[in-house]
Amino acid sequence: MFSKFFDNLGPLPHHIHHRDQHAARVGESGKPEMYFFPAQQNNHNGEFAYTFFGLNEDVSKEEVKEALKNFTKGDNELLSMAKSYKLTLDTGWDVPPGVLHAPGSLCTYEPQFASDVYAMYQSVLFGHHTVTEDLLWKNTPKEEIGNFDYLVDVIDWEKNVDPEFHKHRFMAPKPVRPIEEMEKEGFIEEWICYKCPTVCAKTPDDFARSYGYDSRQRRLWLYHYPGAWKMQRLEH
């Protein structure tokens, strides 16, 4: 496990991280990840503070396949098949492997599994930046290159077209104990990433005690589970 901050001027392409069964074919592991947008790191929203997730419920696999076939013919219009969400500071999203996502331009704290598998399914970005075709086939087994059905199979279809995607994937901070109880002790500790079965993150009480609590200065603590809780890395 590891965590990072990414802070892009504009949005990233609608892309995907492979699930275990597809990643294993190229000797890798699947990559779950989560996002959190800390207010203290975002004095500027960048060019596009919206993120696209998944696909519209009425989109068919054939439509996605056709868009992927048009990757080298200009804008393949994949984003027209997806929903965008305005990003809200001090909230986050769960992004399971197999879910298409085009991250927006807020500075983002990202706890994730230590894997680098991905493929870019969108050909032309905001600002007319283009994506090269080799990234469409990134981490595809050699024998599957050119097989657009394989690219569609990489998509976790049920999760992408989930009509309750926001309900299942959006994460608002959750106090670990009653707020009144923690305020009496001079700090507030919150879970900020908690819907992934592999990795989670919270604001740590010991650092809040040491530095003094300030709701605008969350410090981020990464854990790995199941099993015993284990601290992996601190970002501040």
Identify the role of each PLM range.
Residues 1-89, 99-236:
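Active-site region of the double-stranded beta-helix
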